[in-house]
Amino acid sequence: MRKYPLSLLKDKNIVTFFDFWGKTRRGEKDGGDDYHLLCWHSLDVAAMGYLMVKRNCFGLADYFRQLGISDKEQAAQFFAWLLCWHDIGKFARSFQQLYLPPELKIQEGARKNYEKISHSTLGYWLWNHYLSECQELLPSSSLSPRKLRRVIEMWMPVTTGHHGRPPDRMDELDNFLPEDKAAARDFLLEIKPLFPLIEIPAFWDDDEGIELIKHLSWYISATVVLADWTGSSTRFFPRVAHPMDIKSYWQKTLIQAQNALTVFPLKAKVAPFNGINTLFPFIENPTPLQQKVLDLDISQQGPQLFILEDVTGAGKTEAALILAHRLIAAGKAQGLFFGLPTMATANAMYDRLVKTWLAFYSPESRPSLVLAHSARTLMDRFNESLWSGDLVGSEEPDEQTFSQGCAAWFADSNKKALLAEIGVGTLDQAMMAVMPFKHNNLRLLGLSNKILLADEIHACDAYMSCILEGLIERQARGGNSVILLSATLSQQQRDKLVAAFARGTEGQQEAPFLEKDDYPWLTHVTKSDVNSHRVATRKDVERSVSVGWLHSEQECIARIESAVSQGKCIAWIRNSVDDAIKVHRQLLARGVIPASSLSLFHSRFAFSDRQRIETETLARFGKYCSLQRASQVIVCTQVIEQSVDIDLDEMISDLAPVDLLIQRAGRLQRHIRDINGQLKRDGKDERSPPELLILAPVWDDSPGDEWFGSAMRNSAFVYPDHGRIWLTQRVLREQGAIQMPHAARLLIESVYGEDVVMPEGFARSEQEQVGKYYCDRAMAKKFVLNFRPGYAANINDYLPEKLSTRLAEESVSLWLATCIDGVVKPYATGAHAWEMSVVRVRRSWWKKHRDEFSLLEGEAFRLWCIEQRQDPEMANVILVNDDESCGYSATEGLIGKVG
């Protein structure tokens, strides 16, 4: 090892590791010197990692215990030593030339242009092509030098790949000069004595040890990211540009790391499960499903899968949370993530959980509840719940209120949001954990030791279902339980879900074959067993909704006007936005229904208007509204299916797949009311028996290819599987009603069962749909990570251009703005005004209608892009005013040309 005496440090011709910077000011006013030496930043991050193990943050000490290092001090020293390697790629001359402070001996060389390679990949290359041969750098072990190098090789991607993806493996690279390599070697040799207790376990080179390291590398690599993030904060680690003794700086940065550790909220203490009333005081008598999960034997070791299939009103959500609390209280998890199909359903579930979730933990604990989806910052209730994680452990704890909240540290990034004890969000946020998205390892860490609770899983298409199966398999392999909720699943769907769990547990479990009257149903799968349970049904959730048929829009309009004349509230659920806008205009033009009694709700509204309309919809049609519901009409699209708890006297729906019609019918006479619409506590509903009227093509026993498209062109585009649409109409005509729960399985299997027979007229389209089904699943499988190689170089291509959790058409964001006297302002007012002014539409729709709008252009647009940090190539700002000809109105939304 080269020692660096003062004379050497002052020699302008000799480069030492004190001549390499790691962080710069980058416009930050405070934070210490102009730059931070690379050696000090490396030790800052190492100190964070050392203390994270000592405190068992995110289960780090538990992971090392699984790896055979049960002594916390020894494990902490190994992790700190490993973190000293995380930025060795920054010793590259190509990186150092990005910033050349005059005090350092590295000056601008003759060569200025280097291939752009991340310092993560540079560091991994330096290990493979130089440092791996420096035996003196490696910890002690009983393993031979060759085997020890092979073991450390597995850990190098974990530490160098700390920017959200593993490093790339490269062979030809000339970004390092010889003195750069020597400085990196000298630094790593200098820090080695700081960690005298490290001893590499010999079994790490066994097949079992290698497999375990690869499995845990996904989680440990995420903690490297967290150590680097916090270790880079100048709030705790101010920049230091001058050399000093390594041991002295290590002691100094350990003290700083103690303070930085307070950004991680303390692990909450779980409360015992003391019965259903602790969680839900309003439940006097559990539903049969809730009683079933109360009685269920959950004592088996290892992960468990629960599939709860029951009707609307059976208390599935409460049953799932009861089950989750029982599992958490039994030490089988520390928290849960509740995944829902849409942002609207996630927002609604967040509101419900706010009243319940603290009961999962002891009163003195301070757990976090996080809303995780891309627009969560626009939800006022969530923003009000934030408390600063930085203040935990401060000298003013009495200033912090012990109410529900979520650590700001968790909330400032969707990447970290899943790390909170309780998460609520779109299922996509969890699915991204098993796909090659950047920082997927942070999501995996967040889901570790958590129950995955997914609702409305019947709504997943072939692509999403395949990714969900990959997520279930990964959760099971990690020893985590899964709870799935659905109205009804087909046998094929259930088979695939159970098979995914079985792969994760390396078992042979198979889903039971269910008959058409096996409903409601609870499927319980463990590592070695499958148990099925029939669930009883309460009389008050047994319902029969008769089905009627309409064959023209004129018939539908007449039925709406008739309902209004009788003082009833009614909805028409259309399959396309354009159809909804068109019929809304027709109803207004006829003048029979006053504009004040007519609502329009679809997806092409700005976020601010959409929130307003949803609030108004609940006020008019919600559970507790009575007088204001009379003679009210809402024309809407699929946004109404899952997002809001509304109760309608009558309903018309465009023909759609049977599972969606069942979902829509759930909004028809949802709560018990008297003849005047007043809510009743119990007894019979006094309104006319519920009837779902369906606008559909005239029935044809032998339909042709154009059967659906010729009658309902827009609906045919939205739901291209016309054979399933025809099967839906057939089974509903045969049954004459939607009878729940008795006919639920029959309805689903009659449309989605593997043995259904399609008419000859749909032969070509059916072949196309079957081909699309397998193509979509194949694409999803391509995007689900193969975790077996571990967090390693070149395991998958990260961030492919079209990577998405959903195989829907790409959408674009449009910003609405006003421009008065040259001043550009957002359409919305209040907090997050620009975000609340966004409308999202299909890219093809925008391409077709773009020329119908006035757009912000020129210098004003350029300045807006700079201010809002938007890409000018991607951003679109629509100028709006009070004139509806501008293409947007608060009443109709983004219009375009509606036929």
Predicted features and spans:
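Conserved interdomain linker/interface between the two RecA-like ATPase lobes of SF2 helicase motors
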Residues: T505-A580
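Conserved Walker A/P-loop ATP-binding site and its immediately adjacent core
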Residues: G335-W357, L369-D380, L489-Q493
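C-terminal helicase lobe and adjacent C-terminal extensions/tails of nucleic-acid helicase motors
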Residues: R494, S544, Q554-C625, L648, ...
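A substrate-engagement module of RecA-like helicase motors
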Residues: L353-E421, L427-M431
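Accessory nucleic-acid engagement/destabilization modules that flank
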Residues: R2-A271
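Walker A/P-loop
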Residues: Q301-A324, C460, S486
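Post-DEXD/H (motif II) to motif III coupling segment of the RecA-like Helicase ATP-binding lobe
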Residues: L445-I451, H458-H533
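Conserved pre-motif I regulatory segment
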Residues: F273-E309
